[in-house]
Design a protein with these regions (language model features):
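Membrane-lumen/periplasm interface segments of multi-pass, membrane-embedded glycan/lipid transferases
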Residues: 26-27, 38-43, 67, 206-208, ...
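Interfacial juxtamembrane loops and adjacent helix segments
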Residues: 2-86, 318
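Transmembrane-helix signature of polytopic, membrane-embedded enzymes
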Residues: 80-83, 101-122
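Membrane-interface alpha helices of multi-pass inner-membrane proteins
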Residues: 166-183, 187-193
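Perimembrane helix-loop-helix junctions
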Residues: 147-161, 165, 187-217
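Specific aromatic-rich, kink-prone transmembrane helix
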Residues: 103, 138-156, 343
Length: 403
């Protein structure tokens, strides 16, 4: 589409700060609706597109964008304007997200409430209406996570799992995850672990805790040695970047403002501790071990590998501005929280959280609904009226991890 017809750059405008001021000006001038919803945009030949990111490099990368792309196509058929295409595409993504997550959560044998609450947080709602791959990535990860949790529940109950049944249940979500974001594929480590445990049970093999600890320590040690050997010249610099990153008070690494082109704005800062507090209480309310302990610890390990792996990748890459908008974004980490329920169950056994009746569930639901109400309310007021439009863009560029 030729976006210059409505005053936008012809190329990838979401990576530049210009649209913020452009949109703000249009709102003040009263031309926003006319330009975005009434102005018809002509098609542009692929041969004239200089930003090749818009065309895609490999066919399988397009699978993640299939649903919003279909929405854009239908939106253009309805009316060839930016507003029509964006609204229909977001609607398609939202319907896809809601329906798939409903069936995923319905089939879960444990932690249904946790999956539900995390999936309706403001950052997840941004995934649900994303025009990018975020919705697909979240669903693919949640699907395979739920499948693995169900298998782990059966292992905890000492039910026999046939290898044929294992592969039949794991194949489709594994394929779906393969076409998602690269860091999400860390989940394959749990797939491998579950497979090994099933085979070991078939062969009647058993490992002691000491053997497991030694084996895990050796693997982690080898991984650390590889990084040290490969990046030894940069190690001190990277460590200092990590320290400054986690000490900086201004810019949160786990931000809800995941991309400059989000469909919603962040919730007010004062509400974060309330939301996190309710989520922590929900996690700690699960005291029954529903999956094996090795599964719980592996879920925690994968969260840590993902967190530090993503930060490490950005810390050592001097060309980060060429392929990211604001650096390490919340969407890289949020979906991994789904794997923390088992390990926090072990913690909950040490910290007792008791509730009478369904009061805890009601409180968590109330906080979640309030978060969504605030989130959508701020969005309705347009976030660029409430804070400096360049804040998010500048915070990514000036973040300590890039210095």
């Amino acid at each position: 589409m030729d976006r210059t017809k409505i005053g936008f750059p012809a190329e990838d405008y979401q990576s530049a700060p210009l649209p913020f001021t452009t949109v703000t000006t249009k709102m003040k001038d009263g031309t926003y609706f006319k330009d975005f919803f009434e102005t018809k945009l002509p098609l542009v030949s692929k041969s004239k597109v200089t930003d090749k990111r818009a065309l895609g490099k490999k066919w399988y990368q397009d699978i993640m964008h299939l649903i919003p792309a279909l929405g854009v196509k239908v939106g253009y058929m309805i009316y060839p304007s930016v507003g029509s295409m964006v609204l229909v595409a977001r609607l398609f993504s939202l319907i896809f997200f809601v329906l798939t997550m409903y069936f995923i959560i319905k089939k879960l044998k444990a932690y249904q409430m946790i999956f539900t609450i995390i999936s309706v947080t403001p950052v997840a709602i941004q995934f649900a209406t994303s025009l990018s791959y975020d919705s697909y990535n979240y669903i693919a990860f949640a699907w395979l996570s739920a499948t693995l949790i169900n298998l782990a529940v059966e292992l905890q109950e000492n039910k026999e799992i046939q290898l044929k049944d294992f592969f039949l249940r794991i194949i489709l979500p594994s394929i779906a995850l393969y076409f998602s974001k690269a860091n999400s594929r860390l989940l394959y480590l749990i797939v491998l672990a579950v497979f090994i445990v099933i085979v070991a049970k078939k062969l009647k093999l058993s490992l002691t805790k000491l053997q497991v600890l030694i084996g895990s320590g050796v693997l982690i040690g080898l991984g650390a040695l590889v990084y040290i050997f490969r990046y030894h010249d940069q190690l001190r610099l990277v460590v200092s970047k990590f320290i400054y990153t986690f000490m900086e008070p201004y810019y949160s690494v786990l931000t809800t403002q995941v991309i400059s082109g989000t469909s919603t704005a962040a919730i007010p800062a004062w509400f974060y501790p309330i939301q996190y507090g309710a989520l922590i209480l929900l996690f700690l309310s699960y005291t029954k071990e529903q999956v094996p302990r090795w599964f719980a610890w592996l879920g925690l390990l994968i969260n840590l590998i993902n967190l530090f792996g993503v930060l490490f990748k950005f810390a050592i890459d001097p060309a980060f501005t060429e392929h990211v908008i604001t650096g390490p974004q919340g969407r890289y980490f949020t979906v991994f929280i789904l794997l923390l329920a088992p390990i926090l169950t072990l913690l909950a056994q040490k910290i007792s959280v008791k509730s009478t009746g369904s009061w805890l569930r009601r409180i968590v639901l109330f906080v979640s609904l309030m978060a969504l109400a605030l989130n959508l309310g701020v969005t309705t007021l347009r976030s660029y009226y409430l804070h400096l439009p360049m804040d998010e863009y500048r915070s990514g560029i000036e973040h300590y991890i890039f210095k």
